[in-house]
Amino acid sequence: MSGRSVRAETRSRAKDDIKRVMAAIEKVRKWEKKWVTVGDTSLRIYKWVPVTEPKVDDIDLKVTDENSGLLRRPKPNAKKTKNKKKTKDDKCGSELTTPENSSSPGMMDMNDDNSNQSSIADASPVKQENSSTCSPAPDQNVSAQPEGSEVKLEESHSNASEQQDSEVSSGQNSHSSIESSLNSSEKAETQTSGDKEITVEASKNSQDSDDGTPPCKKVKGDSSQPNNDGI
């Protein structure tokens, strides 16, 4: 029995504590910090003040700006807003009753179509003029192409003639080189033959000198021998 009574007491205390906490929360919710003037003076203090329940008209005044977090400026009274709405309605009614707007939407569409057609008609001669001005360009291109082809043909002919001249000059150079080589070989042969003759004469002279008789006497002796044979 003692245990049950203790549990009952704790439950009642817990309930009392919960009630106190809820009362404190509600009290805190009804308080806010605001700048308040002290009496009739211009002195202002930032302190906790109980929240006064706002009226329906003042709900919009306390809507905070999402970006700045500041209170927005107070909106005009309901009477002023009603007057503004009336003036806007009057203006809209006057615009609707004007003779320009009195025409049906079908007429407006017709006018728009006519204006579009006229603008297209005005733009068509401009396009024709542009096409006429642009048309001579292909003729110029066609005339420029044969000129370019003629220039290319002349260049090819000049290149061919230059190649022929180079071939002729190379052939002449080859002929001249062959002739010079032949002349040099002939000169070498003549020099070698002359050297051989000189060596033969030198050998004969050396033989005569070995015999001790002068060459003139030898010649005379050789000529007298056939005469004696004839006698």
Swiss-Prot record:
- Pfam family of the protein (one): BCL_N
Q: Where is the composition biased (Polar residues)?
A: 95-105, 113-146, 158-173, 222-231
Positions of disulphide bridges? none
Residue segments, region Disordered: 62-231
* Biased segments, Basic and acidic residues type: 186-199
| Bias kind Low complexity: ranges | 174-185
Which stretches are tagged as biased composition: Basic residues?
72-86
Report the family membership.
Belongs to the BCL7 family.
User: This chain belongs to which protein, by name?
Assistant: B-cell CLL/lymphoma 7 protein family member A
> What is the name of the gene encoding this protein?
bcl7a
